[in-house]
Amino acid sequence: MRIVVIGATGNVGTSVLEALARRDAVTSILGLARRVPSASYPKTTFAAADVSRDDLVPHLRGADCAIHLAWLIQPSRDRELLWRTNVLGSTRVFGAVAEAGVPALVYASSIGVYSPGPKQRVDESWPREGVPSSWYAQHKAEVERRLDRFEEGHPDRRVVRLRPALIMKADAAESVRRLFFGPFLPSPLVRPGRLPFVPHIPGAIVQVVHSHDVGEAYALAATGEARGPFNVAAEPELDGRRLGAAIGARAVTVPAPLARALAAATWRLRLQPTSPDWLDLALGVPLLDWTRAREELGWAPTRTAEDTVRELLTGLAAGASSDTPPLRGGDRAGEIKAGVGGRPV
């Protein structure tokens, strides 16, 4: 099999490359990214391509499967650029897959696609309108609607959608810091056992999953015969109290309105890059039931949610990074100069 991975150099993309390379059925991998990395991966060659403007068809011709991962989270202050890359760029990918005759497409959706609901497990049939106030959720929901139309127009193509929870690994620590915490995070203090407290925001319950496990899910989807949507998450779900217990920190209750006001103020002041609607997302989305992934993909996580968070925090404290542009070590002065959340990561 020849597989093209679009958005191959980030947190998820690098894990997907590693998982694909372990499979005998995969003979070659083409990794597409805005910036070609100096790092090398088995069976993989890289090419530069921007989903928002470049011709993707030549890269996709002859592929047995395309995995579309490319997505921008920053700059959070430029919603037009985010829409152009995430929604219009995904639409261009789907069109290129059709024109190039690629028989299978695996798309990186998200827990964020789901409509608000109670904090209970839902399967893949839950409504997909996203949290109304979250730009991320609205982009994910719109792309899935466009993918619906792609499937209707191309019933001969095998389409898979993975809807994972929050994805983490140590090598992506500096990337996660730039995306969500910014240049003023006192990284050495977030090591498990050193962090004095974490906020417990009633109603904010999240799921996480290790990037390597997500990479395995994509490899299973790409090389198998499965179709349709699959939730992907690890156990257990985490609130502030459970998170605090996992990392040896005291959980301090912070009401959701106060937490949102603090997030909004610090974002407006450019002290951190995460807009307050991310808290709306954490409060609004339901929890994922990943039974279908286990039964039809043969997938299961190999790491617990607590272990994954501990690994990320240890990586944050150490400044862990990797040799691709999205995962590189941080340029905190450059982040400040760009306005904290003012440029792509």
Q: PLM features: residue spans?
A:
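Conserved Rossmann-fold NAD(P)-dependent oxidoreductase catalytic core, especially the SDR/UDP-sugar
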Residues: L88, R92-Y136
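Active-site Tyr-X1-5-Lys
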Residues: S133-V160
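NAD(P)H-binding glycine-rich loop region in Rossmannoid oxidoreductase-like domains
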Residues: S38, A48-L88, A96, P116
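Alpha-helical substrate-binding/gating segment
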Residues: L185-E237
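NAD(P)-dependent short-chain dehydrogenase/reductase
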Residues: F150-V206
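N-terminal Rossmann NAD(P)H-binding glycine-rich loop of SDR-like oxidoreductase domains
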Residues: M1-R22
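Mid/C-terminal beta-alpha module of Rossmann-like enzyme folds, strongest
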Residues: G215-T274, W290, R310-L313, G319, ...
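Glycine-rich NAD(P)-binding loop of the Rossmann-fold in SDR/ketoreductase-type enzymes
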Residues: L81-R92, Q138-H139, V209
